[in-house]
């Protein structure tokens, strides 16, 4: 390789004291980094011969960063390759002379800490004779500090100095002169055979004076001798008496009230406090050995803890409640000592800093006392609520504790420790562990059997009721939330605690279902439906329902009839599908959250569908104020969780809501063990006003026409009417043969209910089969579901070829889409669709065997999950009446009822009873 004849280097100092170096060849072209290392750093030790250089090249120019010592070594030692001709830029030439001087001083070990700079609060290095000045002196100081890391012995010595004499960097303390400074920090050797230290002794009796003793420690043996004047010195030490005098002078200059006539001095309690908390630390920084009482470390690091000793509610009631005010007394604790409020006030009045109480020294901090008094005044003004205790206790149980508890606990009791009574401690243990809950027997009036997890749910609801807390039963769809509530209602009534009715607010589509479930499982309960144009209003409202056990109403009426509903303090207010109040700002949500009830219960398989504020709305109904204001909740949880996915905040929120939210899924082991492999559930739904009007008109017109018909014509008319009534029950557009209608769900309560079911199913990421007899209905459902959920929905019907059907089935089984609509005839037999674990029969087939065959598309060999079957039945219509007949003749169904033809054999009177719309239809 051809050697370079000439290299031009340019060195420039940066603001932080480091330097940059760039180099150019004879053609004034930037020297490549590899060439720069070879020709300039070949003998440069501190960069390990160019290995540890930081590249700070900028556009078009190669440059490296050098520390102060690296630059001194490079320029002052001339570490360049001897085969290179190195030239300097005009700006760099002055640096060569300075670097050479600095290098020579450092190489000779001619440097030491600068005492004058230290006294002004600055640490610097200087040469022994103080020759260097200006820029060279500044560079010298930086270079020495940098050089220390490259010299093992020097680095070890410097670390020892900083550890033994922190004053060198804290600038605390006092030294008599430069020699005292260098000797004190250990830069130069102290020739005396001993070191001088101080020991603080506490008084024998509280209030007496404290004592400081001077002692001498033998450098060789480590033995201690207490100094009692020059006469007490060993003969071999007497030559160093001036060392003791200088130390006494230094102690006095550092702590003006600290002076010695001999080796002992007495100080006041106030001076003892200053010595313990401030002066001793300054002296230690100066390298003085200080011996303090063994208890001081603990007392120094401790603060007095303000405690609220909580008994129970003011009247000692077992019924607590989220907003109940609790009785408490103040206690003050520190170092294992607990003081009453009176004892604490007596201490504060004494204006002392150190007090010996029951053999223990206690620190009294005036600033801390002021802070505690402010806390006490605020807490007493606002009162202690059960919600304050619960939030704190639940947060304390979270792994990792509460580093930012101020953001979580915003009550007046933030920073105050709770000392709970045994009663409250037991209650919180039951809330958090949800174990050992009081056992209640299922009422003999309950006409059914609760599975173990359902009985637990009833006990859990009753436990929260007895404790005064609202509850959210959030079990998976199909696990029996309704019957757990019914068992709860019966127990409350039979325990003699029911003075007013229970109120159930539910979507219109499930009011009929509640009526039937209550009638089936609790026929002894008096159930009233507050619905329809003839419902009681005004002053008649309360009297009308005073003898009812349960009143049912809809979400829509909860706002329309808010005045009437608010006039009663209900025994229980139960919200079914409680996510209906998720928007806290709607009139409906606000109206419901203002209703008064002894116990508030929310039922919801999806208590939070999209936003955390939905959860807040439900909890504000259940336990008002527990999660704070909506604004505060948004700041503490919504923003950190939804914006930043803050795992700690998620954990905190889970801790807060867990005691009041019970959720079991079909995948839970204790639930799965008690579930049948298949659950068939009937969903009872009313007709919309449009459906009811069309239904009644069709029945009237048909019976008017039927009187003139006989035989086959009569049978044909009945079958025609039957089919058209089923279409009306499905959707008015199906009966009216409307094409591409946009207003779908609002005209059919059954379709609204389908949307509710599908929302819950998709929230669990589960799959579903939907069976219908009508192609147009299937197309309507497909259109609506795709628009609602934004995902493809397939429809398997008779218009598809075999290959198309096979492809649909194969993709569904591979879970490429979660929802499959099937026409009953095309998809009811012969298919294996075990990817689904929900089956919805949107309209009924009068032969149960046909429905069962359709259900068995999912419930068959290969199905590894629990299968939930939903049969949708419009109340008061032909669908419900035939369902009742089928149930009552179940034994004969498979043998006799194989088609709809049996209906045509009924008498006209029987047909009128069967087809006429009942009062429960709307």
UniProtKB/Swiss-Prot annotation:
Its EC number is 3.6.4.-. Gene3D superfamilies: P-loop containing nucleotide triphosphate hydrolases, Tandem AAA-ATPase domain. Pfam families: DUF3670 (PF12419), Helicase_C (PF00271), SNF2-rel_dom (PF00176). Coiled coil: none annotated. SUPFAM superfamilies: P-loop containing nucleoside triphosphate hydrolases (SSF52540). InterPro entries: Helicase_ATP-bd, Helicase_C-like, Helicase_SWF/SNF-rel, P-loop_NTPase, SNF2-like_sf, SNF2/RAD54-like_C, SNF2_N. GO terms for molecular function: ATP binding; chromatin binding; DNA binding; helicase activity; hydrolase activity; nucleosome array spacer activity. A motif (DEAQ box) lies at residues 576-579. Keywords: ATP-binding, Helicase, Hydrolase, Nucleotide-binding. One of its GO terms (biological process) is positive regulation of transcription by RNA polymerase II. Residues 753-907 form the Helicase C-terminal domain. ATP binds at residues 475-482. Disruption phenotype: No visible phenotype in presence or absence of DNA damaging agents H(2)O(2) or methyl methanesulfonate (MMS); a double ywqA deletion-pcrA depletion strain has 8-fold reduced cell viability. Residues 462-625 form the Helicase ATP-binding domain. Belongs to the SNF2/RAD54 helicase family. Interacts with the RNA polymerase core. PANTHER family: SNF2/RAD54 HELICASE FAMILY (PTHR10799). This is Putative ATP-dependent helicase/translocase YwqA. It comes from Bacillus subtilis (strain 168).
